[in-house]
Amino acid sequence: MNLLKEVLKNQVYPAMGCTEPVSVALCAAYAAKELGKPVQKAVFYLDAGTFKNGLAVRIPNTSGERGNLLAGTAGLLIAKPQLKMEILKAATPSILKRAKQLIDDKKAFIKVAPCKKHFYIKVEVENGKDKASCVISDSHTTVSKLTKNGKVIFENKPSKKKEDNYKQLLGKATLKDLIALADNADNTDLKYIKKGVEMNLNACKEGKKLKKVGFFLESTVEKSILQKNLVTETKIMAARVADARMDGIAVPVMSSGESGNQGVVAILVPYNVGKKSKVKEEKILKSIAFSHLLNGYVKVYTGSLSPLCGCAIAAGVGAAGAIVYQQNGDLKKITLAINNIISDIGGMLCDGAKSGCALKVVSSVDSAIRAAYMGLNNYGITELEGFIGKTAEETIQNLGNISITGMCDVDAVIVDIMKKKVK
């Protein structure tokens, strides 16, 4: 098994809109297609993280509407699971009208699934006596179970062979292993990674049309509040893409770690830094491969959806490591960079996907570039301080322990606050 290829296949793909509500729509589409009749009633069971991430974010092709429920109900009516994470490009005014009618008639509603620690979506649909259901779990596109009228149509049981689970292997990899994987990325890998760069640059153009975080950040440069330099330029670029995604603009973005905003940071930061530093294209693309691997590695420990902000922390770790990698920094310097960024923004909370994510993206970009150049100059936070470990791997594992073990109540409190906002 080639871990890089597995990460690219499972975690790096085009997504239109915030990935959690899109995954809800995808799950609904599978259930509706299996039912084979117009859906008269639907119940959406979501893990707390998916509920949180889809509550306030705008949905593509809905004229600015928000939320998992509308996305999922639209997915029921589209019923084209073959569209995968671009399913909402098929949302039409007619579909939205029918979706809103189902919601208004109390025929479609959401429940937060209890005690689900990992990514989990279940959609149950009905038409008279006929029923169907779909479960997507562990990743945004992995169908784990499909049923119709009580009969299991499909079930994806986890393999008992550890070598079949790329995430387990990724979690056991060392930083040295990940560097070697990036070094040996082949032309197919690099071509796909370049496609992601181009896709995200195109999304940046769409974000430029909005008067949001990227716009106001650029205005501070025009007013000489901030200097025009590599760091500021990269922050503006990344903010524009996040602005576009969170505003529901119907433009695809290449994800990383199964997240579009993480793809913004993990891809565009090493791309722009490398380009401005006149690094050869092949090296830049390999550094982005390393960024994807690092992002995926962090999320093995912190969880797919976490109380911690993934687009800032996990993707920021990937970006910081990638910058050092493309500057031919050694293992020690990459370790210092990773320790620096985790020490800086390792406690940033996730309170769901929304326009404010662009602010966190900007903070991540700033921290990643600073952390990388400090590491390149042999400066970094050591294991004598806080939760920083002796190695980058240990630091990331400590962060994961804080996220999974130490912050369960934090996530519950955030979700409880957000539930009160649902009318």
Swiss-Prot record:
GO MF annotations for this entry?
A: L-cysteine desulfhydrase activity
Q: Mind telling me which InterPro entries this protein's record contains?
A: Ser_deHydtase-like_asu, UPF0597
Q: Which domain of life is it from?
A: Bacteria
Q: Please report the organism this UniProt entry assigns to the protein.
A: Elusimicrobium minutum (strain Pei191)
The name this protein goes by in its record: UPF0597 protein Emin_0811
One biological process GO term for this chain? L-cysteine catabolic process to pyruvate
**Parts forming coiled coils:** none
Which family does the UniProt entry place this protein in? Belongs to the UPF0597 family.
Pfam families, A to Z: SDH_alpha
